[in-house]
């Protein structure tokens, strides 16, 4: 957003034209003032695109939360942004669209953010070719590495260290697998309920998932889960709440 604001703006215009949309908003959290300023400067002549600075909070980037924050329209249970007349795309997609149209280059590389238990000088953004194995990227893995594809909240553990960079690989979180808290029984504290942005009962849905009670999980609203990970993060017993919910969610889709 700081390096290529003009290209991103052109990419947004191309997507608007393809979707037949007359207005677009680029939402930026308030902890990224330089990005917001760069984009605003690039959009001076584009009156149909604006930059909206939003309060930094998690999970602000979820499409349902983002649409409500920007437009005030609330997306109902089981619905998509299109149901309220909105389409949500990320900045990387806008840049890739510009690149494809302006230069003819398909999506053969992308920016990947690397962070976690690695040397502080190696925690940065890399341009990686699609298909590059994780363990061949220019950073040093810890002795017992665990690679999370994505961030620490919503990311998924890579099955193999040589798994490839894909078009949706926005970042990698490198962890030391030797550091792992002991999982304890649920104490019914309600922390996960308070943390859930969708108003669900994660402790209950995860129990249904663990016991393979798919119908009960569906009735409890598992399909509305954003998979933001706030439940697992808030759990004092270190229960893998989100993992169980993901299993139930996948089974209920069948």
Q: Which residues does each predicted region cover?
A:
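Short glycine/threonine-rich loop-to-helix capping motif typified by GTGT followed
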Residues: 32-41, 158-165, 236
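Active-site gating/interface segments in enzymes
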Residues: 59-60, 66-71, 142-188
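Short, solvent-exposed helix-helix connector turns and helix-capping sites enriched
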Residues: 3-4, 32, 212-213
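Hydrophobic alpha-helical positions that pack around
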Residues: 21-134, 139-142, 151-152
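Ferredoxin-type iron-sulfur electron-transfer modules in oxidoreductases and energy-metabolism complexes
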Residues: 170-183, 193, 197-233, 237-254
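Histidine-anchored nucleotide/phosphate-binding helix
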Residues: 2-18
């Amino acid at each position: 957003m700081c390096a290529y604001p003009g290209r991103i703006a052109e990419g947004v215009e191309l997507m608007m034209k393809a979707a037949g949309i007359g207005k677009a908003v680029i939402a930026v959290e308030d902890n990224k003032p330089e990005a917001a300023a760069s984009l605003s400067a690039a959009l001076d002549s584009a009156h149909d695109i604006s930059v909206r600075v939003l309060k930094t909070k998690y999970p602000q980037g979820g499409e349902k939360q983002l649409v409500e924050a920007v437009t005030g329209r609330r997306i109902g249970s089981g619905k998509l942004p299109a149901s309220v007349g909105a389409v949500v795309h990320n900045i990387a997609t806008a840049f890739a669209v510009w690149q494809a149209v302006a230069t003819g280059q398909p999506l053969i590389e992308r920016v990947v953010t690397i962070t976690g238990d690695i040397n502080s000088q190696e925690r940065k953004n890399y341009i990686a070719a699609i298909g590059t194995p994780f363990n061949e990227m220019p950073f040093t893995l810890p002795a017992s590495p665990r690679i999370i594809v994505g961030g620490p909240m919503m990311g998924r553990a890579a099955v193999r260290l040589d798994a490839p960079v894909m078009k949706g690989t926005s970042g990698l979180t490198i962890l030391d697998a030797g550091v792992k808290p002991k999982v304890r029984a649920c104490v019914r504290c309600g922390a996960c309920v308070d943390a859930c942005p969708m108003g669900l009962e994660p402790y209950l849905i995860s129990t249904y998932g663990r016991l393979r009670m798919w119908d009960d999980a569906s009735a409890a609203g598992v399909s509305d889960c954003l998979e933001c990970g706030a439940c697992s993060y808030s759990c004092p017993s270190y229960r893998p709440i989100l993992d169980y919910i993901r299993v139930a969610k996948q089974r209920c889709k069948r």
